[in-house]
């Protein structure tokens, strides 16, 4: 089909992602720094390329930051780039995480979890004295469930137990909006080509602040 001159692919500016509820019991007793370390560890464990290759299969690009690749900066240039004034933590991916999951990513995830107070056995799995049990909220679309199952397997590499909570669309939206979740499926397509359209949802009073920042 890609070789068909009548076939055209139109890109969208948006990001498919998983969101944490910052008020979840998952973070009870943790400092701000420890909670950040936990979230980073989860992100390092997820194999984005596998999801794109096996579930997406339509040429999506991996997300290594929330603002998508190609979004304008409002000054005639591209927002997501390394400059003299700012270099992304992962310079090669121009984002916050490597573009390819590796053994180093898994090992870094373990170290981050250790810094958050978790212990590991000799075989690299979470010790039974410090388990992580998390519920992932998603709607009942086949593709979304397949992505959740891939994430479940990835997190299981270090012993994180993720339960998938599948809800009908309207119930899913309400539960997520009310903050009745630990970890949830999210996605945002930009309404207009400016980073503020992606970033304003993290303001406390935003109607899209599903992560419950400042609440």
Could you say what each language-model-derived stretch is?
Residues 18-19, 27-30, 144-146, 172-175, ...:
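Extracytoplasmic/secreted cell-surface and envelope-processing proteins
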Residues 2, 8-14, 173-215:
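Acidic-aromatic pocket-rim loops
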Residues 33-153:
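Append "and occasionally in soluble cytosolic enzymes with long acidic Gly/Pro-rich linkers
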Residues 1-2, 37, 149-158, 170-181:
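Short helices/loops that flank or line small-molecule/ion binding pockets
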Residues 37-40, 44, 52-53, 98, ...:
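Extracytoplasmic/peripheral linker and loop segments enriched in polar/acidic and small residues
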Residues 1-24, 49, 53-62, 190:
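Extracellular/periplasmic solute-recognition and catalytic clefts
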Residues 8, 135-137, 163-167:
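General small-molecule cofactor/ligand-binding pocket signal
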């Amino acid at each position: 089909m890609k070789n068909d001159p009548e076939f055209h692919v139109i890109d969208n500016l948006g990001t498919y992602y998983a969101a944490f509820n910052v008020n979840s019991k998952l973070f009870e007793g943790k400092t701000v720094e420890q909670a950040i370390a936990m979230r980073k560890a989860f992100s390092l464990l997820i194999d984005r390329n596998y999801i794109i290759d096996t579930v997406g299969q339509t040429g999506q690009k991996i997300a290594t930051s929330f603002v998508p690749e190609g979004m304008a900066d409002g000054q005639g240039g591209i927002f997501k780039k390394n400059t003299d004034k700012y270099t992304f933590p992962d310079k090669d991916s121009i984002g916050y995480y490597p573009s390819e999951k590796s053994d180093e990513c898994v090992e870094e995830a373990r170290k981050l979890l250790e810094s958050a107070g978790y212990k590991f056995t000799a075989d690299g799995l979470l010790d039974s004295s410090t388990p992580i049990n998390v519920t992932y909220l998603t709607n009942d679309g086949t593709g979304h469930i397949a992505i959740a199952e891939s994430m479940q397997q990835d997190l299981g590499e270090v012993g994180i137990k993720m339960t998938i909570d599948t809800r009908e669309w309207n119930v899913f939206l309400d539960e997520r909006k009310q903050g009745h979740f630990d970890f949830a499926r999210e996605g945002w397509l930009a309404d207009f080509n400016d980073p503020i359209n992606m970033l304003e949802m993290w303001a406390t009073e935003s109607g899209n602040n599903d992560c419950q920042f400042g609440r």
